[in-house]
């Protein structure tokens, strides 16, 4: 039998070389080897030293020397005490430390033994060596560690291999660490070789003992790894972890349980780091070898029917893979992959199992998942705030799915979104529900992906519906608030209108009082005057009464005296009566007629003959007829008011003498027609004031027609001449400009056709039967072409055929269906003649005007007479603003309409546009009528545009005067400004210009991080919070800033002018000749209402100007120099800047707070990380000296109890907050950098910027976590 000391041989030569000595230089008492005991003791001490130092020396992969492996030294029966007496105290201490390690004592128990005396230590070492030698001789008398290695390499199979493995497992569990070290890397390599062979053979043919042998090897590995030496040796192998992963076979539950536990223990090892990633790599390699999902064996184990221990082991391995990872993305990715394989449904079944170990693992999984979910949600929320642009987000998503398997699914999602019901109320609810569903899918409550193999998704619909109901209520409240705001504006407008009306009534009442008071004063004065006059009259009456009485008395006396005198004078008067001459007759009595005075001389200077004596009763005698051959002398002109006697016609052959011109006021006498053969003499022009000259008589046959004379300036136009007599030459045509010029005579004046370049031939002239719609292209003429261009080579006539032209005529005919139908009804030769008739030529309108008018009429599809009736009736139900505007724009000029109205008899021969002109030409005063109708249609809109502007400025003026908080802000600004300007020329100010408020941000702080505006905003926040309410009190300042007082005045003046024009048109409008003409009736009422509206607007505008002027006096500025728009624009800008300063102050404080919390969180996270590391090292410290045993048992116990996974929730939450804070800071900095880059480059690359923010934020959050 080989003694125990022989088991220390493997690898010793290699280790001795590393220490700088050869194996032959071992301690010995002599070179002859005579003292066998001392040699054995020295040999034993060297082996113990080598065993002690083996943990700190990396095992080489080369196999030890076989000769050395087979050699062994026997302790024999040497007395141990005698042997220890020959070694030094230092060597005893080395053996004592090795004894403590083999005894598997912890540090607390080792410390008291180290404090013992050297004599006691020597005795203890002696007893331990003696006991160990006896036990080893008893236990390993049959089989040593090297023998196990030889047997494993001998190719045992089936039952023999199973027996060997069971014996090896017992030896590994019962022997001390030194025995395990002797078994070492060679024994481990032998076990792994057998395990690999069994795995490979199992894939081909599986024997009865293969699974049992594999399981027994896993148990041997567990026993081998129950100390730090075994774990390190296992980790140094290349395929050890992979073989453990391959051993996870759900078909062999017990073996899979042990393999999963071993892998779980390896995942939570503190050193080396990232052991869980090595296990994941091994699982990935196995999945690639077997072409399955890497977590599929774990899912199969969790779905196994009976073995609860297997389910616990698989879930324990899942927790061990996820929990140690520091990166949040890594943990979420692993959970997502597991959920995608169906873990979510399996978890529901596992929660129904009543098992303490299962409950521990489920709690660990749920708690860690919830924390990761909140971490991820917080990080994504911060990043999402920077991604509020639809185009950028869509482009990012499109780039991520482009040219991948997800692209058709993304397209399908977009297509389904197009199917959302197009309802104003329902569409937002659809999108809310879709958003919540997507959020719960991609951000599962456990931070994992759903099971994509099952369409069943567990979504909290009830919670979503409740939230949607609440959001709907909020939206309804917001809509109601908006409606109330509109009502408030309307009430405010009505209040201003009532104030203006009330002020007007007050002014009218005061004016009426003043008028009545004036009338009263006038009546009082008149009454006083009447009373005075009455008194004067009474006095005069009394005076006159006395005089009358006196005169009456004198009259009586005179009568008496006359009576007496008359009696005395009777006789003398009778005798002298015959000598008195006869008195002339009174006017109006009959008597001799006094001859009239002679008439005035004629214009030629001839003296007229004396008039004959008048006949009785004043009857005039007509003049005698002229003598034969004598000159026809006209009678003398009649006096004013007498009846004109026409002269007799001249005798044949006599020369016609024109009558003298009539005197002013007389009726013009038409001249007689000229005699045959005589030259027609034009009549003289009438004298000023006389009536128009009648048209000249028609020329006699054979005479030459003389054109009528032109009318005198200011006189009426001449009527058209009568038609000529038969046989007489025609009347010469009118001069150019008075009508359509006649066509040139055929056959005369046609120039020769020019020769076309490049061999071009003139294009064929087509004559369609009806006019077609004409394409509006840019025509090329021959001079525009070049020799090599395309158009010189075209031969379009090869496509010419009658069928093509017929189709074109049918499809693009410019005539309406009605006219075509009428033509179809006509039969025989008339139908053919109509079809061959040429296109109707324009007679009055030019082609452009006619075309524009035709296009306009084509958009209405109304008969012309109906359009006329609508305009006459002023039917606002049919008339629109655009229609009237186009009518005014396209309507021909009045002269053209007058000319078209004269062609009424030729209506059917006119073009459509001219037919419309004929119909509309019958409407009296058409253009003024259309302008008035247009103004009526636009009036309400004008009022609605002007009134809100007046109300906004008026309300803004009142708000500024009443706002106490704004006044307080001005006071604070004045205080701060005077303090800052102390010692300068601007110190001691009593006030400042309002425009200075916008310049507050120009004054920066010393550190350039704050402005005076930010300081005032922060001052108001801390000490005067009520002042922050002033923006709400100036609600109408924004609307007032958009009002131009100049434009407002112009609009009012324009409205006044338009109302006056309409009123004048209505007054001057002729009497209606058509019963449908309602223009005057409707416009009269409109003018009255419009005038009232205008007066109201004018008063409101006057009130606005008064308030603004008072505001200028209040804030000390000149309203004439500072317009309404400029003043309120400054206030509006200051209001916005103040609100922005408040937000920036809040953001700055939040940033400082985040930085402070991030710093504290970082320090705390580092502290927690160190504590966590220490806790993990408490399980096992792989870097500590010594060969600690029971390591695997401790790890498995920590995994089972959940102690290996426990961590305080506080650090994770703090880390999340810290990560969010740092993410926000980084995102803001990157945004600023992007903004600067964008301002310089003008065209930033949006997708790259967003990706950079995501990557940097993700990296930073991972570091912070």
Curated annotation (Swiss-Prot):
Named from the GO MF annotations, one term is: profilin binding
Q: According to the UniProt record, list the residues that bear N6-acetyllysine.
A: 1050, 1096
Q: Modified after translation how?
A: Phosphorylation at Thr-761 is stimulated by cAMP and regulates stability, complex formation and mitochondrial movement.
Region of interest (Disordered), residue spans: 1-42, 54-83, 573-742
Q: Which UniProt keywords apply?
A: Acetylation, Actin-binding, Cell membrane, Cell projection, Coiled coil, Cytoplasm, Cytoskeleton, Hearing, Membrane, Nucleus, Phosphoprotein, Repeat
On whether Membrane is a keyword of this UniProt record, the answer is yes
Question: Which residue positions does Phosphotyrosine occur at?
Answer: 1114
| Domain of life according to the entry | Eukaryota
Bias kind Gly residues: ranges: 1-12
Query: Does the record carry Transport as a key word?
Result: no
Q: Which residues form the FH1 domain?
A: 625-757
Q: Which Gene3D superfamilies match?
A: 1.20.1170.10, 1.20.58.630, 6.10.30.30, Formin, diaphanous GTPase-binding domain, Formin, FH2 domain, Formin, FH3 diaphanous domain, Leucine-rich Repeat Variant
| Cellular location(s) | Cell membrane; Cell projection, Ruffle membrane; Cytoplasm, Cytoskeleton; Cytoplasm, Cytoskeleton, Microtubule organizing center, Centrosome
| Cited InterPro entries | ARM-like, ARM-type_fold, DAD_dom, DIA_GBD_sf, Drf_DAD, FH2_Formin, FH2_Formin_sf, FH3_dom
Q: Which residues carry this modification: Phosphoserine?
A: 22, 1247
Summarize tissue expression. Answer: Expressed in testis. Present in Sertoli cells (at protein level).
Where does the record place the modification Phosphothreonine? 761
Q: Where is the composition biased (Basic and acidic residues)?
A: 54-65
Q: Which residues form the GBD/FH3 domain?
A: 84-449
Q: Which GO terms describe its cellular component?
A: actin filament; brush border; centrosome; cytoplasm; microtubule cytoskeleton; mitotic spindle; neuron projection; nucleus
- Record-annotated DAD domain positions: 1187-1215
**Quaternary organization:** Homodimer. Interacts with the GTP-bound form of RHOA. Interacts with RHOC, PFY1, MAPRE1, BAIAP2 and APC. Interacts with SCAI. Interacts with DCAF7, via FH2 domain. Interacts with NCDN. Interacts with OSBPL10, OSBPL2, VIM, TUBB and DYN1.
For this chain, the family text in UniProt reads:
Belongs to the formin homology family. Diaphanous subfamily.
- What does its UniProt record remark on the domains? The DAD domain regulates activation via by an autoinhibitory interaction with the GBD/FH3 domain. This autoinhibition is released upon competitive binding of an activated GTPase. The release of DAD allows the FH2 domain to then nucleate and elongate nonbranched actin filaments.
This one is known as Protein diaphanous homolog 1
Q: Which organism is it from?
A: Rattus norvegicus (Rat)
